[in-house]
Amino acid sequence: MDKEHLKKNLQEKMEKALKVLDHELKGLRTSRASVNLLDSVTVEAYGSKMPLSQVASLSTPDARTINVQVWDKSMVSSVEKGITIANLGLTPATDGQLIRLPIPALTEERRTELVKLAHKYGEDTKISLRNIRRDGNEVLKKLEKDNVIAKDEHHSLSEQVQKLTDDYSSKVDSVIKQKEQEIMTV
C-alpha cells in the first residue's frame, strides 16, 4: 500500500463513519416532522416484511405532520400496525388510504434524553475515527519497518493522519452541536 492510497483509504473510512453518524441522527426525533423518522418502520406486505417507503409515499405537509399515502387500500391496516409496532410515539389517524401522523411536542425530559443519545452517537463515531487512525498508523509503522518509507517520512505522514482525524473529529462536534440545537428548539 503506497502513501497516497493509504491517505485516501483513511479519508474514505472517516467519511463513511461521518455518514453513519448522519444516518443515526436523522432517526432521532425533533419537534419538526421528517419522513426520516419512518425509516425504521417495516410493514407486513404480500407475505414478507417491507420498508414503509415501498408500500406508501411519505410527505410532510407542515412542520407537525407526516402524511403516509398508502398505495394499496388493503395495506392500510398493515401500515398502521407497522407504525404502532415501531414504537415511535406516533398515533396514526386514518382517512381512507391517507394516514396522518401528528408529531407531538417533545417534553423537556425527552429532549434531554435525545441530546444525550446524540452525544453518545457522536462519541461512538469519534471512537471509530480513532480506530481508523490507529489502523493507519500501524500501516505506516509496517511501511517504515519494511524500509518502504524513511523515519522522517513516517513522522510526517503520522502528523497528516492525526490532522485528518482532528478535522473529522471537529466535523463530528459541529454535527452534534447542530443536532442538539435542533432538538432543544421548541
Swiss-Prot record:
One Pfam entry name: RRF
Cellular component annotations (GO), alphabetically ordered: cytosol
GO-annotated molecular function: ribosomal large subunit binding
Superkingdom in the source lineage: Bacteria
Keyword Flavoprotein in annotation: no
Predominant cellular place of this UniProt entry's protein: cytoplasm
Keywords: Cytoplasm, Protein biosynthesis
The keyword Cytoplasm is assigned to this record: yes
One biological process term in Gene Ontology: cytoplasmic translational termination
Record localization: Cytoplasm
InterPro entries assigned to the protein according to its UniProt record, in alphabetical order: Ribosome_recyc_fac, Ribosome_recyc_fac_dom, RRF_sf
HAMAP family linked: RRF
Function statement: Responsible for the release of ribosomes from messenger RNA at the termination of protein biosynthesis. May increase the efficiency of translation by recycling ribosomes from one round of translation to another.
Family recorded in the similarity comment: Belongs to the RRF family.
Protein's UniProt name: Ribosome-recycling factor
